[in-house]
Amino acid sequence: ANLLIATGHKVEREYYFNDAGSQIEQLGASVEAAYLGLLGRPAEAPADGYKGAYVADLATELRAEQGDALADLDPEARRARITDWSFRRMLAGIRQTLSRLGVEFDVWFSERTLHETGAIAETVDDLRERGVVEDRDGAVWLRTTLFGDAKDQPLIRSNGAPTSCGADAAYYRDKRRRGFDRLLFLWGADHHGYVPRRMRAVVRAFGDPDDTAEFLIGQLVSVVRAGQPAKMSRRAGDIATVDDLLDEVGKDAFRYTMLRFSLDAPIEFDVEAVTRQSLDNPVYYVQYAFARISSVLRQGTETGFTALGVDETDLGLLDHPMEAALLRRLAAFEEQVVMAAVQRAPHRLTRYAEELAAAFHRFYAECRVLGDDHALSSARWWLVEATRQVLANTLALIRVDAPERM
């Protein structure tokens, strides 16, 4: 989103959360079983429910907040109360985690609203008028095979309940009706394959060009420590939460490391490597370059150096090979931003930051910035100042801090 805004697009960030359907019901049933277990009232958890350690954490928090009285409610009322509480608590946790990450959304969109406002029924009627809906076996089907899908997709089940495809189609229609002409959907690895194919058919069913929507699929992240699978603190299971990683490595190391990989590449997150204070750690390497640049400029100011005005400076004096290499990297900034935006490839910016940092480190090793030649020192001063600005802009786009000191 930052890249699209930087290249002139008007962007709205939206988080779509699934608060309807079987997943929420399974969450509620799983927490309910764990809650009753804490009270010595064993209850069988659903076979297809959630089994992570966070379920036990939620149950413990629920009991601490609401006591034991929920156990005496009518089972249906208890399930509804616990389901609603569990969902709200999970959503609050997601918001808090994203805030720690420096990720902001303009809109939080509830799937439930599509059901409650009749948007799904309206979507079915719209598609029916377009001649791409068929009633079959008591269900309502979208004829996605007309648009390249392997098989038709149900919109409404035979029992009258909307399917996930029905909700997804309604959500797509809602966004288009709100005036958006380009839609980017970002999903997790569990949506690989069938969801993008199905949604491309939905786009075509509405008569929209293929490039109206893009479907970006992330990959799984494996967390390791010194090459071995890492068990994070607090958890007995085989998952590591983003909060676990943030507690250990911090926002900058987490964001930078994740953004070094293209979206379609599996990620191995080495906890020790990303926190190592050495130049073989990319985030440290880049931030150290910025701190060194700041130190050079600070020392110049403290020693009373005053550069010639930029218009008075003879930049033609920058003829050392390392100066030329640094200038070339600086000149590439705008192209890198545009290409990263067009290709939906933020990892281009982390690689660019590393290349720019490397070019500066080589320049610094071979070219004395503040010497006896005032004209040359002024030219090099402005080169360092330009490097500082471009590196700061690059880090700002990926929302990683640019430290003045390290």
Predicted regions and their residues:
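Non-catalytic interaction-recognition regions
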Residues: 1-406
